[in-house]
Amino acid sequence: RCILRAADPNRMVYWSRGAVQDIYAYSPYSPSIAKEADMTCIPVSLPAEQVQSGADSPAHIGKYGFMYAQPCHITPETDMSEGVSLVFKQLFAIMNIRLKLTPDCALNEIPVIRMKLESAASALAYDKATVNMTTEDGIPVVTPGSSSNNIVLKFAENIILNKENYVSFYMMVAPGIHSAGDLNLEVIARDNSVYSVDIAAGVNIEPNMVYVRDFDLSLDSFVPADPYQIE
């Protein structure tokens, strides 16, 4: 359901006869921002630190996203009888990292406490940015303010890797072009040992897409931390 209200409660929303009305929609909505709304520079952010609640759970992804609809330009007396259709898309993309232990791994289970995705090419997260919703093709343009080339995914509880099934980890990432080897993935185990791999294939991360990468890890793949410390 979409409800139209005036940004100022003391004002009314009305249609100007014969005038084209421009309708923009996005989420999350901030009343404090909407009062001074400028569709050419809507504030947006994508945290460089994200928290997943548990194994295979994408429940956290929604709070990091920014949804937008293709703008509608209508003339009330001729177009309103057909209503206004708003189709929402995601401004960012989802990276689904799937991990499993190799059959010959010396351990049947390895608990992991966090992971990091880093790019040598472009930003993966925005501390501050703005979005222009008024582009001719209706595809928003992001102007970064301050950005980060890495995303750290933490877990509400330790997640256990096993030999039987892939375990899914989800990150919300910013669009960008990454050539072969630009992206590096680190997986940190409970003993602080680190599995690190450069993602061989290049990827052009586009909005509203899901990217899946599978990795099989052996015990020897983890480099011990110095000094050894259990978290």
Short names for language-model regions:
Residues 114-138, 199, 203-210, 215-231:
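Extracellular/surface-associated beta-sandwich interaction domains
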Residues 46, 54, 120, 147-149, ...:
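Compositionally biased regions
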Residues 96, 117, 154-196, 200:
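Extended serine/threonine-enriched, polar tracts that run as long, contiguous segments within proteins
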Residues 81, 95-165:
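Short helix-loop boundary/capping segments
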Residues 1-109, 162-166, 191-193, 198-199, ...:
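Short, low-hydrophobicity acidic/polar segments
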Residues 22-25, 115, 182-183:
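Contiguous beta-strand segments of beta-sheet-rich domains
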